[in-house]
């Protein structure tokens, strides 16, 4: 995590440069919109198309797949994408949930994605599963009654497990 949803920078410029170099050596990265902008040295994208182009710019010449997460953008639908180094793009959409229970969404998505990839899913399959799971976790986070009133509460990581 380089930049929080609040916009606060969580690391200094030297660490940002080190992360740029490290990110080019990993299989998959999951930056939020402000983090993606830092990785490519541009202003944060204001549209999904701009974010996808920034991801394509980043992974050009690398073997790194970039997950574009559209949660910081506006609209009734959240668009996310797997942007592969070979130019393949898979878009995964979910309805936007209007809630204050969004604390930890980026870390939760990254963890779910890594788990599904380790279980044998392709990155695209892993993102589809993870977005569906996270959408449910966000939608039901308010039922936890944590961080309220007025604060950002967590998503409900265990919602799906309790439905089994």
Question: Where are the regions that the model predicts?
Answer:
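Phosphate-handling active-site elements
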Residues: 88-90, 116-130
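Conserved beta-loop-beta/alpha segment of the NTase-like Rossmann-fold superfamily
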Residues: 4-6
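Charged C-terminal helix
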Residues: 125-164
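Short pre-catalytic strand/loop immediately N-terminal to key active-site residues, enriched for Gly-Thr
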Residues: 89-104
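Short, small-residue alpha-helix embedded
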Residues: 38, 100-123
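Glycine-rich beta-alpha junction loops
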Residues: 35, 70-74, 95-98, 130-134
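Conserved phosphate/ATP/ADP-binding segment of small-molecule kinases
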Residues: 10-89
């Amino acid at each position: 995590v380089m930049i929080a949803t609040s916009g606060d920078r969580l690391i200094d410029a030297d660490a940002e440069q080190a992360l740029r170099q490290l990110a080019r050596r990993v299989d998959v990265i999951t930056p939020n919109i402000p983090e993606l902008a830092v990785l490519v040295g541009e202003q944060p994208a204001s549209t999904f198309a701009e974010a996808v182009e920034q991801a394509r710019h980043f992974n050009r010449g690398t073997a790194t797949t970039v997950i574009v997460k559209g949660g910081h953008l506006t609209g009734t639908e959240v668009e996310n994408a797997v942007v592969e180094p070979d130019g393949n793009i898979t878009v995964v959409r979910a309805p936007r949930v209007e809630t204050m229970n969004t604390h930890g969404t980026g870390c939760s998505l990254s963890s779910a994605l890594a788990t599904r990839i380790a279980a044998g899913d392709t990155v695209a399959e892993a993102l589809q599963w993870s977005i569906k799971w996270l959408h449910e976790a966000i939608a039901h986070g308010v039922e936890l009654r944590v961080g309220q009133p007025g604060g950002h509460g967590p998503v409900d990581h265990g919602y799906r497990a309790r439905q089994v």
